[in-house]
């Protein structure tokens, strides 16, 4: 089956593919930022990296590096489930506009969460963006469960 036929087999799939690819790119950006912060703060996780950049005293932790790592871990805890849920949801035959809104709300919520986390924005901005992004995931999960249960 040609690639364009697979994409067109579900009207919601192109929107999911666009948003999920942007989210993966966002995760790469956070990883790059983490590396840049490590270099700027001279805080390396591995002795061989510290030796290369000034000596063993630079094998240490740093609060800003730890913040980047927490942001990345939070991405993994939320984006990986979204990739599964969104893919399956795309094949349930959802209204294309509603599907777009699910995917877009998650994407915007996660980007805003990263900005809030790395930018050290005041509370409760980060928790609001986290919750906002989780709402479409909960909706998709419930719809998947409902459809799966109906077909038992």
UniProtKB/Swiss-Prot annotation:
Q: What is its EC number?
A: 5.3.99.3, 1.11.1.-, 2.5.1.18
Residues in the Cytoplasmic compartment per record: 42-60, 120-123
Q: In which pathway does it act?
A: Lipid metabolism; prostaglandin biosynthesis
Q: Does the keyword Metal-binding apply?
A: no
Q: List residues traversing the bilayer.
A: 13-41, 61-90, 96-119, 124-152
Main localization category: membrane
State how changing residue 70 to S affects the protein, per the record: No effect on protaglandin-E synthase activity
The entry's stated outcome for residue 49 to A is: Loss of prostaglandin-E synthase activity
Q: Which reaction does it catalyse?
A: prostaglandin H2 = prostaglandin E2; 2-glyceryl-prostaglandin H2 = 2-glyceryl-prostaglandin E2; prostaglandin G2 = (15S)-15-hydroperoxy-prostaglandin E2; 1-chloro-2,4-dinitrobenzene + glutathione = 2,4-dinitrophenyl-S-glutathione + chloride + H(+)
Q: Which residues form a coiled coil?
A: none
Tell me what happens on changing residue 72 to A.
Reduces protaglandin-E synthase activity by 70%
Lumenal-side segments: 1-12, 91-95
Q: GO CC annotation: what is one? A: membrane
Give the induction note: Induced by the interleukin IL1B. Induced By p53/TP53.
Task: Give its localization.
Answer: Membrane; Cytoplasm, Perinuclear region
Residue numbers marked as site, Essential for protaglandin-E synthase activity: 49, 126
Q: What is the effect of changing residue 66 to A?
A: Reduces protaglandin-E synthase activity by 50%
Q: Which UniProt keywords apply?
A: Cytoplasm, Fatty acid biosynthesis, Fatty acid metabolism, Isomerase, Lipid biosynthesis, Lipid metabolism, Membrane, Oxidoreductase, Prostaglandin biosynthesis, Prostaglandin metabolism, Transferase, Transmembrane, Transmembrane helix
List the Gene3D superfamilies: Membrane associated eicosanoid/glutathione metabolism-like domain
Describe its function.
Answer: Terminal enzyme of the cyclooxygenase (COX)-2-mediated prostaglandin E2 (PGE2) biosynthetic pathway. Catalyzes the glutathione-dependent oxidoreduction of prostaglandin endoperoxide H2 (PGH2) to prostaglandin E2 (PGE2) in response to inflammatory stimuli. Plays a key role in inflammation response, fever and pain. Also catalyzes the oxidoreduction of endocannabinoids into prostaglandin glycerol esters and PGG2 into 15-hydroperoxy-PGE2.
Q: Which family does it belong to?
A: Belongs to the MAPEG family.
Assembly behavior: Homotrimer.
Please report the name of this protein according to its UniProt entry.
Prostaglandin E synthase
Origin species: Homo sapiens
Taxonomic lineage of the native organism: Eukaryota, Metazoa, Chordata, Craniata, Vertebrata
Q: Which gene encodes it?
A: PTGES
């Amino acid at each position: 089956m040609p690639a364009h036929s697979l994409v067109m087999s579900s009207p919601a799939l192109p929107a999911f593919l666009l948003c999920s690819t942007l989210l993966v790119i966002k995760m790469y950006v956070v990883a790059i930022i983490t590396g840049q912060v490590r270099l700027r703060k001279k805080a390396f996780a591995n002795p061989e990296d510290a030796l290369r950049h000034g000596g063993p005293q630079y094998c240490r932790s740093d609060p800003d590096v730890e913040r980047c790592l927490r942001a990345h871990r939070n991405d993994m805890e939320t984006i990986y489930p979204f990739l599964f849920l969104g893919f399956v949801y795309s094949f349930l035959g959802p209204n294309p506009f509603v599907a777009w809104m699910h995917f877009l709300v998650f994407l915007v919520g996660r980007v805003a969460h990263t900005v809030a986390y790395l930018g050290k924005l005041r509370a409760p901005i980060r928790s609001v963006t986290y919750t906002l992004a989780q709402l479409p995931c909960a909706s998709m999960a419930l719809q998947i469960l409902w459809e799966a249960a109906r077909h038992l």
